């Protein structure tokens, strides 16, 4: 129940925020979970290594390069909503790391899937969104794609993978979605990469690799989830 609620709230706040802010700012603010995850993880007893700090700073810099569009406007309501969404994404990653140690990952994913779906359906009714056959037909394939590939398969792999990966490193790996979307646009849609975007991809890759390297513990005692 908790995972489904966190997933729904994070996604909802991010999508509502996009109404008022730009895609570039939204992407950068959302990716701040890279920094928030290691901070929140300290509360649950996870260790913070020097390599984590270096990796997070490098990756966030890379995200900035990827999302930078030349100029940013002043902070608006959309930015605040997106930041709140980033906090819920952070809690989702940290909570998964805790729950997957004691519960079956597949069962967690199934529960998350149905709770998130129910909350989305309830939200649609509450906001008075019309539900006609024409709308259902038009939105059927996008909904099926998001439900099966993104929520169903994607988040299931995340939960199963986090059984053997500390939350800080998991957050860095999850942030690669920006890199994959950029490269997919380049390969499939023939979009051109700017020097900023290329630099961002390189920095994010360096940051993720750096976080995996052994280094001294800055705070706490390293706690790795048990492997099945």
Describe every region a protein language model picked out.
Residues 17, 22, 43-48, 99, ...:
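Hydrophobic/aromatic residues within transmembrane alpha-helices
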Residues 48-68, 86, 120, 196-215:
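Hydrophobic transmembrane alpha-helices of multi-pass small-molecule transport proteins
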Residues 139-141, 175-228:
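C-terminal-most transmembrane helix of multi-pass membrane proteins
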Residues 33-54, 179-198:
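C-terminal transmembrane-helix exit sites in multi-pass transporters
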Residues 1-13, 77-85, 133-153, 174:
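Loop-to-transmembrane-helix transition segments
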Residues 26-32, 96-118, 151-187:
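Helix-helix packing/entry segments at the starts of transmembrane helices
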Residues 1-30, 65, 147-165:
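Specific transmembrane alpha-helical segments of multi-pass solute transporters/efflux pumps
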Residues 36-38, 56, 74-128, 143, ...:
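Transmembrane alpha-helical segments that form core, pore/gating elements
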């Amino acid at each position: 129940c908790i995972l489904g609620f966190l997933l729904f709230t994070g996604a909802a706040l991010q999508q509502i925020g996009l109404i008022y802010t730009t895609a570039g700012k939204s992407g950068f603010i959302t990716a701040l979970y890279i920094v928030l995850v290691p901070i929140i993880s300290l509360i649950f007893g996870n260790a913070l290594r020097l390599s984590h700090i270096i990796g997070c700073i490098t990756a966030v810099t890379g995200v900035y390069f990827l999302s930078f569009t030349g100029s940013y406007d002043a902070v608006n309501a959309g930015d605040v909503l997106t930041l709140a969404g980033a906090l819920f994404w952070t809690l989702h990653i940290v909570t998964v790391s805790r729950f997957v140690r004691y519960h079956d990952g597949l069962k967690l994913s199934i529960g998350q899937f149905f709770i998130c779906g129910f909350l989305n359906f309830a939200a649609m009714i509450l906001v008075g969104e019309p539900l006609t056959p024409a709308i259902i037909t038009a939105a059927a394939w996008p909904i099926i794609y998001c439900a099966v590939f993104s929520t169903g398969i994607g988040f299931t792999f995340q939960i199963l993978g986090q059984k053997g990966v500390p939350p800080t490193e998991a957050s860095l790996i999850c942030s690669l979605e920006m890199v994959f979307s950029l490269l997919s646009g380049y390969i499939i849609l023939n979009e051109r990469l700017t020097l900023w975007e290329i630099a961002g991809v390189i920095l994010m890759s360096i940051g993720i690799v750096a976080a995996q390297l052994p280094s001294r513990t800055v705070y706490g005692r390293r706690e790795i989830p048990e492997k099945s």
